[in-house]
């Protein structure tokens, strides 16, 4: 049986690293084979592209350049890591995937959605996530968390208005596709966030049990 593909999304400071720990615990407890990965990145070549995308630099990065770099990394990621794992029946948990492109390069940067659609169809095709968990926090809280980080990347340093568009974009994605995209209120306590994530995973696992 083909594995299941779950993406984890959210703005900067939404707590994805902690959420990944909770997801890993739940999968281990339920003895579900899985791999954890991330975007941009996930393979040696894609990780090199990640550095090009996220490293702060004096030269400004053209919006189209950023978009194409992200999709180049995604093509490699899919071919070398995601698709082989799914074909083996392994679950794939990815820290960011296609929704981030629509939100960051589309909504927040004002990118061409028609171009995004074409790239998504060409690069991703039918390999879209079976489910997506969006960690939602008010931008103010996310920014408070970001400033506590020892290292901040190029996206961390974007304006408040940019990050507000990111939050709005993820909420719009959830509203447009509520069956696939589920919101987790990540402004709550860690115990609450863990409980919400476990509840969503349990529902998904139960629903997918019929695919066996």
Swiss-Prot record:
So what does this thing catalyse? Answer: dTMP + ATP = dTDP + ADP
Pfam families, alphabetized: Thymidylate_kin (PF02223)
Residue runs in coiled coils: none
- A single Gene Ontology molecular function, please? dTMP kinase activity
The alphabetized UniProt keywords are: ATP-binding, Kinase, Nucleotide biosynthesis, Nucleotide-binding, Transferase
What GO CC terms are in its UniProt record?
cytosol
InterPro entries in alphabetical order: P-loop_NTPase (IPR027417), Thymidylate_kin-like_dom (IPR039430), Thymidylate_kin_CS (IPR018095), Thymidylate_kinase (IPR018094)
Q: What residues does ATP bind to?
A: 10-17
Among the record's GO biological process terms, what is one? dTTP biosynthetic process
Kindly indicate whether the keyword Transport belongs to this entry.
no
Q: Which CDD domains match?
A: TMPK
Q: Any idea of its EC number?
A: 2.7.4.9
Give the family per the record: Belongs to the thymidylate kinase family.
NCBIfam families membership: DTMP_kinase
Job of this protein: Phosphorylation of dTMP to form dTDP in both de novo and salvage pathways of dTTP synthesis.
Under which name does UniProt file this protein? Thymidylate kinase
């Amino acid at each position: 049986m083909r594995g299941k593909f779950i993406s984890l999304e959210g703005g900067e400071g939404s707590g994805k690293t902690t959420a990944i720990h909770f997801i890993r615990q739940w999968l281990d407890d339920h003895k579900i084979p899985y791999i954890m990965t991330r975007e941009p990145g996930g393979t040696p070549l894609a990780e090199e592209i990640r550095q090009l995308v996220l490293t702060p630099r004096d030269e400004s990065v053209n919006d189209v350049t950023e978009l194409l770099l992200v999709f180049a990394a995604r093509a490699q990621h899919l071919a070398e890591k995601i698709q082989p794992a799914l074909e083996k029946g392994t679950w794939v948990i990815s820290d960011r995937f296609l929704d981030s492109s629509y939100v960051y390069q589309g909504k927040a940067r004002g990118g061409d959605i028609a171009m995004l659609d074409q790239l998504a169809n060409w690069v991703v095709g039918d390999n879209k996530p079976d489910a997506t968990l969006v960690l939602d926090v008010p931008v103010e809280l996310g920014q408070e968390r970001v400033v506590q980080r020892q290292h901040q990347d190029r996206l961390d340093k974007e304006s408040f208005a940019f990050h507000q568009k990111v939050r709005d974009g993820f909420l719009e994605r959830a509203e447009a596709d509520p069956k696939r995209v589920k919101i987790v209120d990540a402004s709550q306590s860690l115990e609450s966030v863990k409980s919400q994530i476990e509840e969503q995973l349990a529902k998904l696992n139960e629903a997918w049990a019929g695919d066996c």
